[in-house]
Amino acid sequence: NLYQFKNMIKCTVPSRSWWHFANYGCYCGRGGSGTPVDDLDRCCQTHDNCYSDAEKISGCRPYFKTYSYDCTKGKLTCKEGNNECAAFVCKCDRLAAICFAGAHYNDNNNYIDLARHCQ
């Protein structure tokens, strides 16, 4: 779920608040359209697509689904025992948080004009 995703981001990118990713580029945050502005925005596009795939699992609501995971010294692990939906959503969030950690953050791409840059 989004709360757990926020905590996964805190695990992999402890130097930056999750809030910095909430309105970044064309895909980080609500919705998403157009061409991603950079690698970090592509991480968000991939995460959005992953959640769309999760929704194809019967009854799976990725924004609200809780799952079991562990964060140890910046390393994320989705725990055994998650059901199909929880395991899928955990993987989506884990891969995105790892992607965020490896991508450059460009302050100029935070709060961009979506109508102008994301069509």
From Swiss-Prot:
Its main location: secreted. GO terms for molecular function: calcium ion binding; calcium-dependent phospholipase A2 activity; phospholipid binding; signaling receptor binding; toxin activity. It is found in: Secreted. Expressed by the venom gland. SUPFAM superfamilies: Phospholipase A2, PLA2 (SSF48619). GO terms for cellular component: extracellular region. Ca(2+) binds at Y27, G29, G31, D48. Keywords: Calcium, Disulfide bond, Hydrolase, Lipid degradation, Lipid metabolism, Metal-binding, Secreted, Toxin. Its cofactor is Ca(2+). It holds the Pfam family Phospholip_A2_1. InterPro entries: PLipase_A2 (IPR001211), PLipase_A2_Asp_AS (IPR033112), PLipase_A2_dom (IPR016090), PLipase_A2_dom_sf (IPR036444), PLipase_A2_His_AS (IPR033113). GO terms for biological process: arachidonate secretion; fatty acid biosynthetic process; lipid catabolic process; phospholipid metabolic process; positive regulation of fibroblast proliferation. It catalyses: a 1,2-diacyl-sn-glycero-3-phosphocholine + H2O = a 1-acyl-sn-glycero-3-phosphocholine + a fatty acid + H(+). The record marks H47 as: Activity and toxicity lost upon alkylation, Ca(2+) markedly slows inactivation. It comes from the Eukaryota. Its EC number is 3.1.1.4. Binds 1 Ca(2+) ion. The active site is at D93. Disulfide bonds join C11-C71, C26-C118, C28-C44, C43-C99, C50-C92, C60-C85, C78-C90. PLA2 catalyzes the calcium-dependent hydrolysis of the 2-acyl groups in 3-sn-phosphoglycerides. Belongs to the phospholipase A2 family. Group I subfamily. D49 sub-subfamily. Two forms of phospholipase A2 are found in Ringhals venom. PANTHER family: PHOSPHOLIPASE A2, PHOSPHOLIPASE A2 FAMILY MEMBER. This is Basic phospholipase A2 DE-1. It comes from Hemachatus haemachatus (Rinkhals). The lineage of its organism: Eukaryota, Metazoa, Chordata, Craniata, Vertebrata.
